[in-house]
């Protein structure tokens, strides 16, 4: 009996040591694992995983909850605090709920002794909410909401730097929350902005803007205010929408009128004669037939020599800096008021050595057609462009002009220095030069009448 007990005891000791053998070397069977052992192991594993995960609902970290004290910013961001129970700030049990409540109520942490949140002082808001580590004085935030807005809805802060993006593009994605200064738009920008509106409409009031055409009315829906940027003016003389068939007639428009001024006061008083512009269709009452042709300008309508920017100059004048070469060539500058070079109001531009069409663009029959002009009807290089700008390129989608009538596509030129006549192309591949005295009397009929006049 004692031996049996000893054997049993040896078996128990061996089992406890994990060997499973008796001291005598006789192998003993391991005891079976019951279902209760599996349940205990699973529960321990689940508790271990929850401890590692640090679940929000099972937090038992020793962080003090101090009602009335500012929230611990590090704890609110990460859920941890290295100071533990010695931290003097508040640690709410459910920090996610506390952050959401602070954002909904518009409450921001009041941390006396910390630097003031500059973004909160200027805009009255803070994107970090309750997690911001700076001080948010509520009495100063009320003054931030009283900032004056310009006509476009952007804040004017005279004591701050000017918004560089706003000066270049006329827009600001931060809107009223931008911390920089947004001055009132210049007269030139407002004038260009209002150039496409009728006298009875306002450029700043949203709504429907109808442009009467010769065939149909084109209504443009506008849901936001636009400003003419120095490079690509919005709602300006440049048509930004391709209009099918029902084309638009804009009286008294020249795409280069605001950019180029005549050097002679007498030339400024001369006006074009019954001019049809890009995107317009010839009226049935006109004397040019149904071909949608362009009447030539009177003498002196195309400026040469000294080009001046009319109205207020939106580009900076820096006499002690080199001249902006791009501005001297095109009259435009994509950097706007932040450009570091000199932009003189009067710039000497060499007179083009070719004839110009009624839009002020050069006609170079031997050169390739300007790709940008053929697509959009404009050219930023103006009379200095080295490519050809034929008027026939603009005459697309004409339902009244037969396809085979090629003779109706001809150049209409305005006289320029060194070119006493007007070059006509009757569609036969030959060019004819007409004296200036006879060019004003050329009837706009078929190609035969033009050849007889030459």
Curated annotation (Swiss-Prot):
Residues 1-30, 405-454 are annotated as: Disordered. Keywords: DNA-binding, Metal-binding, Repeat, Zinc, Zinc-finger. This is Zinc finger CCCH domain-containing protein 66. GO terms for molecular function: DNA binding; mRNA binding; zinc ion binding. Residues 1-23 have a biased composition (Gly residues). Residues 434-443 have a biased composition (Polar residues). It comes from the Eukaryota. It comes from Oryza sativa subsp. japonica (Rice). The lineage of its organism: Eukaryota, Viridiplantae, Streptophyta, Embryophyta, Tracheophyta.
């Amino acid at each position: 009996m004692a031996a049996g007990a000893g054997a049993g005891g040896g078996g128990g000791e061996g089992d406890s040591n994990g060997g499973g053998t008796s001291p005598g070397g006789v192998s003993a069977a391991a005891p079976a694992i019951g279902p209760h052992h599996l349940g205990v192991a699973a529960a321990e594993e689940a508790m271990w995983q929850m401890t590692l995960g640090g679940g929000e609902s099972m937090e038992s970290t020793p962080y003090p909850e101090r009602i009335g004290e500012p929230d611990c910013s590090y704890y609110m961001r990460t859920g941890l605090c290295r100071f533990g129970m010695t931290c003097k700030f508040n640690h709410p049990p459910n920090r996610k709920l506390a952050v959401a409540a602070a954002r909904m109520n518009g409450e921001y942490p009041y941390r006396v002794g910390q630097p003031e949140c500059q973004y909160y002082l200027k805009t009255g808001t803070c994107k970090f909410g309750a997690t911001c580590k700076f001080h948010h004085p509520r009495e100063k935030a009320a003054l931030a909401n009283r900032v004056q807005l310009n006509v476009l809805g952007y804040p004017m802060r005279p004591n701050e730097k000017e918004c560089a993006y706003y000066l270049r593009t006329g827009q600001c994605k931060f809107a009223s929350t931008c911390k920089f200064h947004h001055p009132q738009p210049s007269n030139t920008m407002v004038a260009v902005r209002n150039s496409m509106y009728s006298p009875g409409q306002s450029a700043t009031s949203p709504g429907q803007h109808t442009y009467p055409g010769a065939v149909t009315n084109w209504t443009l829906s506008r849901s936001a205010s636009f400003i003419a940027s120095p490079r690509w003016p919005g709602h300006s003389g440049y048509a930004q929408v391709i209009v099918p068939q029902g084309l638009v007639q804009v009286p008294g428009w020249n795409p280069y009128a605001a950019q180029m001024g005549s050097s002679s006061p007498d030339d400024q008083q001369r006006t074009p004669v019954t001019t049809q512009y890009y995107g317009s269709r010839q009226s049935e009452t006109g004397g040019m037939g149904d071909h949608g042709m362009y009447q030539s300008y009177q003498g002196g309508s195309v400026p040469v020599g000294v080009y001046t920017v009319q109205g207020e100059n939106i580009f900076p004048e820096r006499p002690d800096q080199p001249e902006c070469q791009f501005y001297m060539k095109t009259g435009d500058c994509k950097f706007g008021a932040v450009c570091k070079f000199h932009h003189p109001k009067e710039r000497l531009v060499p007179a083009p050595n070719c004839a110009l069409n009624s839009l002020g663009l050069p006609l170079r029959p031997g050169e390739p057609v300007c790709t940008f002009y053929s697509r959009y009807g404009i050219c930023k290089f103006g009379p200095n462009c080295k490519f050809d700008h034929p008027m026939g390129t603009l005459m697309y989608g004409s339902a009244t002009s037969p396809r085979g009538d090629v003779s109706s596509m001809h150049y209409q030129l305005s006289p320029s220095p060194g070119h006493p006549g007007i070059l006509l192309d009757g569609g036969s591949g030959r060019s004819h030069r007409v004296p200036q005295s006879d060019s004003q009397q050329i009837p706009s009929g078929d190609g035969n009448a033009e050849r007889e006049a030459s």
